[in-house]
A protein has these predicted regions:
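Structural beta-strand/beta-sheet cores of well-ordered domains, especially the beta-sheet scaffolds
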Residues: 5, 14-16, 85-87, 99-101
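An extended, acidic, His-containing surface patch that forms the Zn2+-binding/catalytic region
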Residues: 28-96, 106, 110-115, 129-169
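A common structural junction motif
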Residues: 3-8, 47-48, 122-128
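Fold-level recognition of mixed alpha/beta catalytic cores in primary-metabolism enzymes, strongest
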Residues: 1-38, 42
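A generic structural motif
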Residues: 15-23, 101-103, 137-139
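A generic structural signal for short, solvent-exposed coil/turn residues
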Residues: 10-12, 81, 95, 122-124
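Short, well-ordered coil/turn elements that cap or connect secondary structure elements
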Residues: 2-4, 13, 84, 124-125, ...
Length: 169
């Protein structure tokens, strides 16, 4: 096996343990993060370290990890108040003999959970299954409302800053 950036190969029993070393962050602001699962998925695919069924699953997972904007899954979108959708791969684990990859998304008001789930199912095809989907409608309060103005004015008065309100998932 070949070495790769942010991948370590460690002898283990009769095989090799492949570890990915990423950079953590938050699903609402994933810029600059590197998902270790995505690194390992790419390494396995690039080096042909999977059978056909595993390849189909890994290709589906790769679509999640290819872009924190959801491009690989066909769910990328943006609107004025919220900006672009963000999505990250969370934890991967073995559950009842099946690999499970969690994901976490913050999406703008121009889409909804049902639409996103439908788009993800279309993108992953038969390589994986999307289950346990939960979503909440985006919540937004205009920056010029009295409550938000009171909060930011108080913050600026206490800190001496000149901060402005911002939206995050």
């Amino acid at each position: 096996l070949r070495n790769a950036p942010n991948i370590t190969l460690e002898p283990e029993g009769d095989g090799v343990r492949i570890r990915g070393w990423g950079k953590s962050g938050h699903a609402a602001m994933p810029e600059g993060t590197v998902n270790a699962i995505g690194l390992v998925v790419n390494y396995l695919l690039d080096n042909g370290l999977c059978n056909d069924a595993e390849r189909a699953y890994l290709e589906a997972v790769k679509k999640l990890h290819d872009s924190t904007a959801g491009v690989g899954l066909g769910i990328d979108c943006a609107d004025g108040p919220f900006g672009p959708l963000t999505i990250i791969g969370g934890k991967m684990s073995m559950v009842d003999g099946r690999m499970v990859q969690t994901m976490d998304s913050r999406y703008p008001t121009c889409t909804d959970g049902d639409t996103i789930a439908k788009q993800i199912r279309a993108a992953i095809g038969t390589g994986a299954e999307l289950t346990d989907v939960g979503s909440a409608k985006p919540f937004y309060i205009e920056a010029d409302t009295p409550a938000i103005k009171a909060c930011i004015d108080t913050y600026n008065e206490v800190t001496g800053d000149n901060a402005t309100p911002f939206t995050m998932g």
